[in-house]
Amino acid sequence: MLRLGLCAAALLCVCQPGAVRADCWLIEGDKGYVWLAICSQNQPPYETIPQHINSTVHDLRLNENKLKAVLYSSLNRFGNLTDLNLTKNEISYIEDGAFLGQTSLQVLQLGYNRLSNLTEGMLRGMSRLQFLFVQHNLIEVVTPTAFSECPSLISIDLSSNRLSRLDGATFASLASLMVCELAGNPFNCECDLFGFLAWLVVFNNVTKNYDRLQCESPREFAGYPLLVPRPYHSLNAITVLQAKCRNGSMPARPVSHPTPYSTDAQREPDENSGFNPDEILSVEPPASSTTDASAGPAIKLHQVTFTSATLVVIIPHPYSKMYVLVQYNNSYFSDVMTLKNKKEIVTLDKLRAHTEYTFCVTSLRNSRRFNHTCLTFTTRDLVPGDLAPSTSTTTHYIMTILGCLFGMVIVLGAVYYCLRKRRMQEEKQKSVNVKKTILEMRYGADVDAGSIVHAAQKLGEPPVLPVARMSSIPSMVGEKLPASKGLEAGLDTPKVATKGNYIEVRTGAAGDSLARPEEELPEIENGQGSAAEISTIAKEVDKVNQIINNCIDALKLDSASFLGGGGGGGGGGDSDLAFECQSLPAAPAASSAATPGALERPSFLSPPYKESSHHPLQRQLSADAAVSRKTCSVSSSGSIKSAKVFSLDVPDHPTPTGLAKSDSKYIEKGSPLNSPLDRLPLVPTGSSGSSGGGGGIHHLEVKPAYHCSEHRHSFPALYYEEGADSLSQRVSFLKPLTRSKRDSTYSQLSPRHYYSGYSSSPEYSSESTHKIWERFRPYKKHHREEVYMAAGHALRKKVQFAKDEDLHDILDYWKGVSAQQKL
């Protein structure tokens, strides 16, 4: 069974011709027309020319197979062949007349085979053959008439064969021949080779590879070049044979060769190729074969570089023929230009360095080319230091881009320099403005700005204050507050109608600003820099908070004294509404036994802030402290209309007078009911009651000002009025005020809102703020310096962020505080 299976498989392989046909690649045209058939390297390789290929094929490639012979029967059906490639086969026999049917064949490649000779019968019928390649064969004999059937041959390659001799008439009939490769053959330099050497001198081989032609025998001539002498001696085969075979028979010119050269202009133009046969052995052919200028065309090399060359072409009779300058590259050529003048200067560019080029002057007639003279030269090699001319604009583009980039760098550098210089000037101006602002905050706006700067520049000389203002606070309740000062303070704070900037508004309100003692003013430009500014701002903030806290304490005590009276006071005979509030004694034990009329109001000062504490102070004292609560009632000549209870927390120990210093810190006492009573203006009535024990009962009318309805932080000056208002108007101020969005913006300006984002005094600094500063500071700072810095930022943000009427309200608030302090 196994044998039957193998036999069946073998029969299938033999009976299927499609398996072989599939190995050829066909490029077909219309109607089954085949342009190219590639059957090279077939597996299995072809041993005969395949017959399944369409007969219309033009280019047939059968290279690298195992063809043994070329027969007429295998080629006669391919009548349209123009190219036949039989390279690298095992062809050793070509039948005579095998190519009779190939009348259109132009290229025949038979290289790398086993041919031993070339005869006329092997090449018969190929009248249009132009290129014949039979290199690397075993050819020993080429008959003199082998190429007589191929008059159109342009290139013949017989290199690397076994040719020892050639007849002088072998190539004489090939008028169009331009390339004849004979290198690699073992020539026998005897007298029978002299005829071939005579033809070789006349022939202008395009490749000019004369140095590869040398003698192999006899022994005394081994290694001699056939034509070109060696550099170290002038001996070559043709000179030796010329002297040795002088009496020998010279080869007669073939009948098919044109008539001898004649200088007459009426000769047949195409009868010769421009060489005089009398000069065949007169000179050795140089590297560039040129003739006399008077005899025929000449070509000379004028200049050569590594990428260009300049040729000079001289034509005695330019109009006798059509002359063309042709460039040859091995077996191919290309026309460069048509020569129409007697002397042409041709410039050749785009050449490669260290490359050999061949240019010939050729005449054309009847579609045939006749070489007159050729020139072969080699371009120069690149030398370090020589600059090759650029054939592209790459360098130009690169230089343009680099120039643009360099220009952009210069422009950006100039812009950066200008911006940096401008920024430095702005920072310098800003520093001057900050110092000027600090000086104005310290000395007030009454002093001229120029004099302040001039005074600040004088180190060691304290500036002279134009107005000495005191911020003393009455420590005893029994003191009488002069009404004239209060009236002046009240009339001295009109609301500014026009809008202005921060400096203008604050300069206008500088008359009510607080002055610092002259001995407490440090030097401005003493090298300490920002430390002095922060310290100055912090002290100013401390002073403002001291005044605010004192005024708030006074208001709370006055409100408590008004609301604490049962009824009927010194103003009982009046029809106006009056509030009677009495102050509490210092000792909490005596508060329950003492009469309201005998209460003495303590000092305005609050308990001092202890710096050793690490937590923010609470503004409300605990209910466990010794506090006595008083109730305030509304009394009039009639019945009681309404009553509202207010609570007031009073510390159990009186505040010492000695604590009222500029660096002391004060704590506001918040009302548990968050009553706006501590922010309402107090208007004194016509008469006031008196109390014993050094205490005093103040009969005051409460009149809401227009500031109260606008901003919670507004604290206008006291208004003293002689007239009396209605009861409804006097009681309406007791209603709790609501805070609008606009009011809450500047609520930080009041010390009671100590839980805001920024503290207005160092005493309101909290632990969380301290931790934030600890997180971002690069080095450890002093605790007091951090507190002063926070205070300075708070004051700056509160005042500088205010605009227009908001700024006026802030200034009015401080004016009211100042007026209350003066009272």
Swiss-Prot record:
Cytoplasmic side: 419-823
GO terms of molecular function: protein phosphatase inhibitor activity
Span of the signal peptide: 1-22
Side Extracellular, residues: 23-397
Domain Fibronectin type-III: 292-379
Originating organism: Mus musculus
Subunit structure: Interacts with PPP1CA.
Protein name from the UniProt record: Protein phosphatase 1 regulatory subunit 29
Chief localization: membrane
UniProt lineage: Eukaryota, Metazoa, Chordata, Craniata, Vertebrata
Region (Disordered) residue spans: 249-294, 590-624
Glycan attachment points: N54, N80, N85, N117, N205, N247
Alphabetical list of Pfam families matching this protein: Fn3_ELFN, LRR_8
Superkingdom classification of source: Eukaryota
LRRCT domain location: 185-247
Residue numbers bearing the Phosphoserine modification: S622, S671, S675
GO cellular component annotations of the record: postsynaptic density membrane; synapse
Localization per Swiss-Prot or TrEMBL: Membrane
Transmembrane segments: 398-418
LRR repeats: 56-77, 80-101, 104-125, 128-149, 152-173
Membrane topology term: Single-pass membrane protein
PANTHER family, per database record: ANTIGEN BSP, PUTATIVE-RELATED, PROTEIN PHOSPHATASE 1 REGULATORY SUBUNIT 29-RELATED
Keyword Transmembrane set for record: yes
Gene3D superfamilies, A to Z: Ribonuclease Inhibitor
Keyword tags: Glycoprotein, Leucine-rich repeat, Membrane, Phosphoprotein, Protein phosphatase inhibitor, Repeat, Signal, Transmembrane, Transmembrane helix
GO BP annotation list: chemical synaptic transmission; establishment of protein localization; gene expression; synaptic membrane adhesion
PROSITE patterns: LRR (PS51450)
